[in-house]
Structure formats: C-alpha cells, structure tokens
Amino acid sequence: MTTPPLRPLLNWGLRRSLRAPRLAHTRCPADFGLAFISVRIPSTLDKSLHAWLIPAPASVPLPAPALVIVHGWGSNSDLMLPLAPALHAAGLTLLFIDTRCHGASDDDTFASLPRFAEDTVRAVDWLAARPDIDPGRIALLGHSVGAGAVLLAASWRPQTAAVVSLAAFAHPAEMMQRWMAEQDLPDAVIGPYILRYVQRTIGYRFDAIAPINTLPQLRCPVLLMHGEHDSVVPVADAYRLLAAAGTDKVQLHIGPGGHDSMEAFLAVIDRVSDFLAAQGIARNTGEGDTE
C-alpha cells in the first residue's frame, strides 16, 4: 500500500504522465479550399477556446444547420480537417474546436473527458446564439475521447440534434487499465489508487461519464463508427455500445482502418452525410454544389 509521504510524489508523477501533449497546427481550412473565420469561444473557468468556423455553402438557406467537430486526446482540430470538404459539401456550417490544453486553446490545470464535454457545450451554445445558425439543427461529431465527450455533452444538452461518434471507448476505467498495462504498472498494487486519484481529480466517477452509460440517456439519433483494425480501442467496444443503447435510434458502422486514421473515416464519410440528412440536418449525398 502507498505510504502517505509517497503520495504527493506519486500524484505529481500521475498528473505529469497523464497530461495531454499539445500539438501545434500545421494547416488550416484554407489548405482544403474552404473559407473560414478564426474565433475565440469563452469556456468555463475564464478560459477560451480556439475554433475555426466554416460557414455553410452560399446555396444553403439561413439559418443553416451546423456540426461541431471535436478532436481526440493529444490531438487538435487540424487533424480532423480532412473530413471538412465532404461535410461542408453536405450543406453544413462547421465548427472545429480545440479543447482546453490542446491546439491553440487556453491551457488549464488538466484535461479530461468532462472538460472536453464542457468545451463542446460552450461551443454549441456559442453557435446557437448566432442568427445565421438554426439552433434546432446542431449536431456533434467527435473522435476517441472527443467521441466520449460529444456523447456526454449530448446527455447534458438534450436538444442536440444528432451525434456522430468515431472510435469511442465503452468505459474510461478500461482505457485507464489498458494504459497502466502499457506502462507496466502493477495493476493489483497501484491500479485502484490510480483510478481513485483520477476520478477525484476530474470531479466525476468514471461510471457517470462512461459512454456505455451516457449513450442510453440520449434522445437524439446516434451514428457509431469504428475501425475494424483499431488497436487502441477494441472494436468490441463499439458492439457493446450498440447493445447498451437498446434502440434503433443508434446505428453502427464498422469499416476499415485503425484508431487515428482520418483517411479511413473519410472513405466512408458519405455514411455520415446520409445519416445527418436523414435527420433533416444535412443534404443527401450528391446534392452538394461546386463552390
């Protein structure tokens, strides 16, 4: 058992090892031929978020539908940009956000799935207040931790129109256990302490924020997408999420590719557009214009 004098050192080491790496942007929407505006969005704790706002094509009547895109852990909005042209062509205003401690957003004491979700809700509220956006047609798309975050955000914000989840895990405790195994940490000895420490730090019990528990709470349609070769989050998690949902409002698509392959998700992006079109949010595939 960990003795009290060692706890501050252990806690410091845990906080340090779990800190999300910050990646700088190397490209922007203009690199994909899209006009955009860089904006700052107020979040919690007096922090602000960097975001790229890509207005819907001019042929889309206002107020326009919108999609908020949330990256994964240690990533940024730049890495989600390959999805932008196809989603924009589907008639959507796009908002790519950097969550706190990521990309060009403000730093904070730590990053966590709930803080990702808090930032997502603030971004949605910011969008919904714009006169050019239809507040009833705002959908969410997230990858990995960002996928867990958009599911959590939608459980907090029941008016969410739809959710697209890319490579979501079923339960954060299981992700932590996989991480501990990769670090060769003695799970039986120190594992329970680490799990308690992380939950105490983030202010939430893992059960309260686990996608397998938040997904069944959602009122809106959900599309789960997962790569069959995902070595970070087992594809079995996607099937567990579908089973937990227990409703035909939740769809699952298993495709090629691994965990971080935006190219693999891009190859089946029409499924996302068609799913959103079925909810009255996007245009059907093939209806886009050439601007």
Each model region followed by its residue ranges:
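Catalytic histidine-centered segment of alpha/beta-hydrolase-like enzymes
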Residues: 257-269
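An N-terminal hydrophobic leader/cap segment in hydrolases
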Residues: 1-42, 52
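Short beta-strand/loop motif that positions the catalytic acidic residue
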Residues: 217-219, 224-226, 230
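Alpha/beta-hydrolase active-site loop
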Residues: 110-131
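Catalytic histidine neighborhood in serine/cysteine hydrolases
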Residues: 243-260
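Hydrolase active-site cap/lid region
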Residues: 152-204, 266
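The serine-hydrolase catalytic nucleophile loop
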Residues: 72-86, 99, 106-108
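Conserved alpha/beta-hydrolase "acid-adjacent" motif
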Residues: 231-237
